[in-house]
């Protein structure tokens, strides 16, 4: 059986002394001048993001594709439907029940009779 400790094996790397020297003293100066190509060119300039692309996001098109938990009524629907339903509920806010409530309320109270 191999009784060697994996941690001890790390210290037996062929480059261990070189890495230890870099850790103690830092990297040496480069031979190349400080001009020319740099890997870090600052913040990247990304193209404008558009969710209207057919292949943009699977979650938006059908959240069930990625096995996200969805209600049976949500299967196969995309975000536009959910957003529409939410806005509709916010705008309507129970207005569909207003007629019934008004009718029930009017039955409870009798209107005052006009003066004779």
Swiss-Prot record:
Optimum temperature is 60 degrees Celsius. It is an enzyme of class 1 (oxidoreductase). Optimum pH is 6-9. Its enzymatic activities is reduced by the presence of Zn(2+), Al(3+), Cu(2+), Na(+) or Ni(2+) salts. It catalyses: an L-alpha-amino acid + O2 + H2O = a 2-oxocarboxylate + H2O2 + NH4(+); L-leucine + O2 + H2O = 4-methyl-2-oxopentanoate + H2O2 + NH4(+); L-phenylalanine + O2 + H2O = 3-phenylpyruvate + H2O2 + NH4(+); L-methionine + O2 + H2O = 4-methylsulfanyl-2-oxobutanoate + H2O2 + NH4(+). One of its GO terms (molecular function) is toxin activity. Substrate binds at residues 45, 78. Expressed by the venom gland. The keyword Transferase does not apply. One of its GO terms (cellular component) is extracellular region. Its main location: secreted. Homodimer; non-covalently linked. Negative results: shows low or absent catalytic activity on L-Arg, L-Glu, L-Val, L-Ala, L-Asp, L-Lys, L-Asn, L-Ser, L-Thr, L-Pro, L-Gln, L-Gly, and L-Cys. This is L-amino-acid oxidase BjussuLAAO-II.
